[in-house]
Regions:
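Hydrophobic/aromatic beta-strand patches that form the interior of the parallel beta-sheet core
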Residues: 16, 70-72, 94, 143, ...
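Conserved beta-alpha-beta core of the PfkB/ribokinase-like small-molecule kinase fold
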Residues: 32-38, 81-99, 115-172, 185-186
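Active-site metal-binding loops of divalent metal-dependent hydrolases
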Residues: 20-21, 121, 210
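Conserved phosphate-binding/catalytic region of the ribokinase-like
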Residues: 100, 129-142, 146-155, 170-257
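Conserved N-terminal subdomain of the carbohydrate kinase-like
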Residues: 4-6, 12-15, 23-118, 247-257
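Core dinuclear metal-dependent hydrolase active-site scaffold
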Residues: 2-9, 183, 187
Length: 257
């Protein structure tokens, strides 16, 4: 059997995804003149596009792989990222963040699933107590993408951070694998480096979400972190070629099968 046929014959996976979601608003227009009142460009509005971001983007990409996703998140209108983009230059001019306090979730039992994915943006949804409960009592693989610099709150997990977060890290996760993404350069894990394809980078928004979803799916499919990271690096490079958060297509996924 080919790798594709082998994966297609496997059962569909069930994943519990926990994390903060936001509404991503993209306001497109053109800037062709300078304001008379101040030396700033005038934004002539054309159109608006709304997408689901943060953990919701992880969910969309897990679904692209055929994963059955149980999702615990906040109401997306509590976090809004509003971007203003000049369509002539594809330049992001301004980002406005609207943030409301989130109520921490409470979890005292875990559903039967193949893996748990935590997309932790440190916005208040996930308490250390909930994280500790999950990491202590869930017997399967746990995939974590976190903005928290105190990584020792995570244990028995596969933890993914980016290179900026690595610089701010004040502690290591316990009994865990640590993967560091390196932007357009790829990723590193232990003493291994995974190069990314050379592509034109338009927008890095959501690339980490695709990396996380791909990492989870291919680890469950192959039980190989090597393979999963390689696939995740490749498919994350698809995201950065598009403006805004990106959902993997069937054609994208077939390229790595």
């Amino acid at each position: 059997l080919t790798e594709l046929e082998t994966i297609q014959q496997q059962k569909s996976f069930k994943v519990l995804l926990i994390g903060e979601s936001c509404t991503d608003e993209y306001h497109y227009g053109v800037c062709e003149r300078i304001c008379a009142e101040a030396p700033v460009p005038v934004f002539d509005y054309l159109e608006k596009e709304i997408r689901a971001g943060m953990a919701s983007n992880v969910r969309e990409n897990l679904i692209s792989f055929g994963v059955d996703v149980e999702f615990i998140t906040n109401e997306s209108n509590l976090l809004i990222k509003r971007r203003f983009v000049d369509t002539k230059s594809n330049q992001l001019l301004l980002r406005e963040d609207i943030t409301h306090p989130l109520t921490p979730i409470e979890i005292d039992k875990l559903i039967d699933c193949d893996a748990i994915v935590i997309s932790d943006y440190s916005k208040g949804l996930l308490s250390e107590q909930v994280i500790d409960f999950i990491c202590t009592f869930f017997p399967g693989p746990i995939f974590i993408d976190s903005k928290n610099s105190n990584l020792k709150i995570f244990k028995n997990a596969i933890v993914k951070i980016n290179s900026d977060e690595e610089k701010k890290m004040i502690s290591h996760p316990i009994n865990s694998e640590l993967i560091v993404t390196l932007g357009k350069s790829g990723a590193k894990w232990r003493d291994k480096f995974f190069a990314s394809p050379k592509v034109d980078v338009f927008d890095v928004t959501g690339a980490g979400d695709i990396f996380l979803a791909t990492l989870c799916y291919f680890y469950l499919s192959t039980q190989s972190l090597d393979v999963a990271i390689s696939k995740a690096v490749y498919l994350a490079s698809k995201s950065v070629q598009h403006m805004g958060v990106y959902k993997l297509t069937h054609e994208d996924i077939m390229e790595v099968m």
